[in-house]
């Protein structure tokens, strides 16, 4: 029996080739394309930051998604949702861009102000708007997804909205939410005064049953509490964050309560991009059939970084930020064994 073809709404705060700060942007591009190739109907929602080029990507207005209004605390905030297709060689995946000049269009930084190096002070309002815009998108389009796939704290309020503020909305009981933890260390923590801005019901302004944590509103906790299913990047990590304080980032107990709904799924790669046999970004393509050609790339890498080249001495290049979460401690532990290979 063939697997059911799903309608999937994928919500993210960054995506290649439009904007990127980390691996989330790569996943947000590759996964929807692969799901679409498998026959699912996938649509994406993302903020339209100032760095996104309308003309280059042919982003256009949608009349019925123009000049919508939601409340953020005492403010009426107007926004529109524009659209284009995710550039890809095989499938066309539709993207909806949340367009608001004040919160997104006037800023090139995604979360951090490039001028100060600090988080934007209104990040709470910015991503409240993202959450509310997703609700309004579904209502206005009448396109009811089977699954809403949410990524990291920036999307964490959406499950809470679905189960409270929008619970009586027609057809909102028909879809399920999947919340993916990409980086548990970043939780979207804001002052208690942020709660009023969310418009969520008073009962969620608690620690035991709501979105408060250590005296602050915690967007990540909201996603963990109210999503139907949670996943993270490996089964080992999924076990660690719910059983060990050093991995749980203060949310171990919350995750432990959701253990039956918490899964580990290892990220894959797009073999059409990460394929040395046809990669245009490396000096010399190679494959298992002509592995010796890899030495050309090794020599080029050594020269680029001013290293003495020796065919017999290994060079390891990593595309990564230098954070503990990237597993550099594992390389350190295995280093002596690696050198014996």
Language-model-detected regions and their locations in the chain:
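Catalytic cores of nucleotide-sugar-dependent glycosyltransferases that transfer UDP/GDP/TDP-activated
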Residues: 1-341
